[in-house]
Amino acid sequence: MKSITQASFMKGIMFTFTIAIISYILAKFPILHTIGALAIAIIFAMIYRQVIGYPEHIRPGITFASKRLLKFAIILYGLKLNMGDILGKGWKLLLIDIIVIIFSISLTLLLNQIIKGNKDISILLGIGTGVCGAAAIAATAPILKSKEKDIAISVGIIALVGTIFALIYTAIEAIFNIPTITYGAWTGISLHEIAQVVLAAGIGGSEAMTFALLGKLGRVFLLIPLSIVLILYMRYKSHSSQVQQKIDIPYFLIGFIIMACINTFVPIPSLLMNIINVITTLCMLMAMVALGLNIVLKEVISKALKPFIVICITSICLSGVTLLVTSIMFK
């Protein structure tokens, strides 16, 4: 019995790994590059689920990928942060980042209440829009006790909307020729994923890219205090309800902070950093495959339409406000 469980576990790991590798390779192609590997992995898994069904015989490995590997990827994600640069060079952007996060979450929840959409998905989308896309959703979902299906739907929506906006940004820059620093800062503080920021900021040159990454990584840095606020909120909510729930500080958040400190104070060779980045990406992709397998297309259609509309409106408002702010601050 134990050998059967181990075999199921390994087959599940290999299954998610195989689709992750395929998604990683496909994302290197010109057109698919704009979609991103995370979205490709989820779409691939969704199609598999609709056509073939959920592979029950390898569930243990798939469950491991959706839970453990996802948290491991978040821990490694902390190595992208250099707190010295963010607090030193990018303090102006950090102040804007705080406003961006509050604005995104508040507006998303307000709009969702107006159109009576799915609150669980909308709060994940608000966090993903305000902070750092899929990574923020993955990091805060365990704190919020989110369902795996809601996580997968949220990541898919964020990937789609963020990619569309990144392409729109490049078109706007090409047409209106926004000043380099303003454009870089704008992309960094308003686009959803790091990959989307890099895609959009690339057209502005190296100076635009520097400010874009400072703005974006400032939002990643703010994932730490935001997570603490969410933990306190969930504890308060638990104490206020009749059913008491234990809300612990997630170990992966502690790991994320430790990794950020290591990258800030310990020089890491570029070759090693590149290897870690690939491992982080593959772990995240394997987790997205596992989450995508939980999605039933009918549920996506019924649950995702209103949150999709909400996040599009939020993203449009966020883009407009942040462009105005960066134009004033970085003349």
Curated annotation (Swiss-Prot):
InterPro entries the UniProt entry points to: UPF0324_pro
Keyword Signal: no
Any single GO CC term annotated in Swiss-Prot or TrEMBL for this entry: plasma membrane
The entry's keywords: Cell membrane, Membrane, Transmembrane, Transmembrane helix
Predominant place of localization: membrane
Topological relation to the membrane, as annotated: Multi-pass membrane protein
Top-level taxon: Bacteria
TM region positions: 7-26, 31-48, 69-88, 93-115, 122-144, 154-176, 183-205, 249-271, 275-297, 308-330
Subcellular localization(s) per the UniProt record: Cell membrane
Entry's family note: Belongs to the UPF0324 family.
PANTHER family: INNER MEMBRANE PROTEIN YEIH-RELATED, UPF0324 INNER MEMBRANE PROTEIN YEIH
The protein's name in its UniProt record: UPF0324 membrane protein SERP0111
Organism ancestry: Bacteria, Bacillati, Bacillota, Bacilli, Bacillales
